[in-house]
C-alpha cells in the first residue's frame, strides 16, 4: 500500500514512462519543452525532447511561497513539487483528460513558486480558501485540479470562482486513481 505522496508520484511516473516505452520504444517526449534546458532531457530530436524523471536537486521545498504569504502549505504539496523533476504528464481521471503539472528544472521551480504565489494572492483577494494547483483540465480553460490547503482534499475548481468539487480525499489516493495517457 502506497502511503506517501513521493512514493505515489514516483509510482505513477514509472507507469507513465513504461507506457511511452511500450508504445514508442523511447522515453516520454514533448514538443512544448523543446529548447528549455533540463537535467531530465535524455535526447533531442526534430523540435522534440525525450525525457526521464530525475531526483529533485534542491533541499528547499515551497518555503518561499510560505514566507511570501505567511501561510503554511499542506506537506503533500511540498512533496508533490519537490520529489522529482519531470515533464508534465497527460493523464485521465474519471474520463477527463488532465495535464499533471511537474517541475522541469531549477528555473522552472522558481516560476512555479511565483505562479503559486500569484494564485494564492488572487484567492485571498477574492476571499476564497487557499489551494495549490496540481493539474489543468485539457477540455476547460478555467478548470484547475488543486489541493485544498485547509483539508488536503483534491478538488476541481473554476479559477476565480467559489465553485469547487471534491474529487478525492487526499493526493496519495488521487495519484493512485489517475491513469497515464500516451499522446504524441
UniProtKB/Swiss-Prot annotation:
What is one cellular component GO term in this UniProt entry? Answer: cytoplasmic side of plasma membrane
The cross-references to InterPro entries, in alphabetical order and at most eight, read: Syd, Syd_sf
Keyword Membrane appears in the UniProt entry: yes
Is Transmembrane among this UniProt entry's keywords? Answer: no
In UniProt terms, what function does this protein have? Interacts with the SecY protein in vivo. May bind preferentially to an uncomplexed state of SecY, thus functioning either as a chelating agent for excess SecY in the cell or as a regulatory factor that negatively controls the translocase function.
Topology relative to the lipid bilayer, per the entry, is: Peripheral membrane protein
Top-rank lineage group of the source organism: Bacteria
Q: Which family does it belong to?
A: Belongs to the Syd family.
The gene from which this protein is expressed is syd
Please give the name of this protein.
Protein Syd
**What does the UniProt entry say about where the protein is found?**
Cell inner membrane
Identify the Pfam families for this entry: Syd
Alphabetically sorted, this entry's keywords are:
Cell inner membrane, Cell membrane, Membrane
